[in-house]
Amino acid sequence: MKASAVTAALAVGASTVLAAPSIKARDDVTPITVKGNAFFKGDERFYIRGVDYQPGGSSDLADPIADADGCKRDIAKFKELGLNTIRVYSVDNSKNHDECMNALADAGIYLVLDVNTPKYSINRAKPKESYNDVYLQYIFATVDAFAGYKNTLAFFSGNEVINDGPSSSAAPYVKAVTRDLRQYIRSRKYREIPVGYSAADIDTNRLQMAQYMNCGSDDERSDFFAFNDYSWCDPSSFKTSGWDQKVKNFTGYGLPLFLSEYGCNTNKRQFQEVSSLYSTDMTGVYSGGLVYEYSQEASNYGLVEISGNNVKELPDFDALKTAFEKTSNPSGDGNYNKTGGANPCPAKDAPNWDVDNDALPAIPEPAKKYMTEGAGKGPGFAGPGSQDRGTQSTATAEPGSGSATGSSSSGTSTSSKGAAAGLTVPSLTMAPVVVGAVTLLSTVFGAGLVLL
């Protein structure tokens, strides 16, 4: 089907949706909000204690939130671990998720959700082509499917799209997607659900990417920043791992920061890093993290092994459970940065950071209607994909263009008027970097993550 036909079909679908879909969600859940550089549950500081959850990995891509029986089976294990959050990398936005999301809510568990799938994502080798209206329709439909649940903690706009110096040229498109998601949430009059990015932990541009996602006008800035970190390999320590330097370098950062993946498996995992992550050594800067990963897949990071309805606990399960049981959150507010705020945009430093100005691509023209009409029904996993389909952006966005359409609601929980302190960009030898636990469907697909 030609791109023009796809666009026309989407327009027909969108025109029939004048309001957000009705979702039977729990009303007695306290949503997570952003204050300064921290998350809060009401007036109490919220630290993410979670795992990454995508049973089946790359060999059998499935939506675990649409699998009510499997979800309830695994919630029992989540509760045993003492979790309050799970991350899911791919969901089918054509399916119903009420039963699992409500069961998670009953267990006090929140969801951090990646909006992308392997077929609907930004291609780091062709970011301009893959940032199109067909792609945006898919991820907006995913927002529609989950925004009604109060235990939807946050959305990830991408995962490790930038994984080296040359791929940093895709950063404006990652930031544009983040902007568009935030604008869609506000324009559709959903509650303020944080949107951020999950970065690769690479010395070449980790700090620059963090700075970039928190610079510019409020409508362009992210609500949080996260990165995947496998640099603490037991036996280790706060200093030996280099985590002390990362805390130093991120001190003064104006957004909530957390680990979207952690848990090096080079040696026997004891999860010694848990005691540091939830201590005052780090809580002024970090808001917890997500252990990779719940189910045993080919990369051998699993806490449990799933076979049908049976779940077998592996040694790492007990190790993590013990680490969490021994580690409580700090009392009070954890010395968070109450001011928050924007920082200056990073200067171009090719080949490590190949972004030469602050300009972002404008939202593709056919996608603008979704802000007022809604995205329509999501195509789900069966959809044809968006990598080379749809209409691309043809203009540069003006500052403020990501403000809500037909709404005066605030675009962020923090303000650039209170500028964050400057971050310290480390030398490339700051700390060892261990190869992460995830691979992509293709070496060029950034956001479409497939777990192994």
Curated annotation (Swiss-Prot):
Mutagenesis or variant effect for E160L: Loss of function
Keywords: Cell membrane, Disulfide bond, Glycoprotein, GPI-anchor, Lipoprotein, Membrane, Signal, Transferase
Protein name: 1,3-beta-glucanosyltransferase gel1
Binding site for (1,3-beta-D-glucosyl)n 1: Y89, N159, Y292
Post-translational note: The GPI-like anchor contains a phosphoceramide lipid group. The anchor position has not been determined.
Cellular compartments per GO CC: plasma membrane; side of membrane
Lipid addition sites, GPI-like-anchor amidated alanine: A419
Organism (species): Aspergillus fumigatus (strain CBS 144.89 / FGSC A1163 / CEA10)
Carbohydrate attachment residues: N249, N337
Signal sequence, start to end: 1-19
Ranges annotated as biased composition (Low complexity): 393-419
Propeptide position ranges: 420-452
Statement: the UniProt record of this protein carries the keyword Membrane: yes
Binding site for (1,3-beta-D-glucosyl)n 2: E160, D201, R206
Residues covered by region (Disordered): 325-419
Disulfide bridge partners, by residue number: C71-C100, C215-C345, C233-C264
Summary of pH dependence: Optimum pH is 5. Active from pH 2.5 to 6.0.
Catalytic residue positions: E160, E261
GO molecular function per UniProt: 1,3-beta-glucanosyltransferase activity
Predominant subcellular localization, coarse grouping: membrane
Skewed-composition ranges (Polar residues): 325-340
Keyword Nucleotidyltransferase: no
Domain of life: Eukaryota
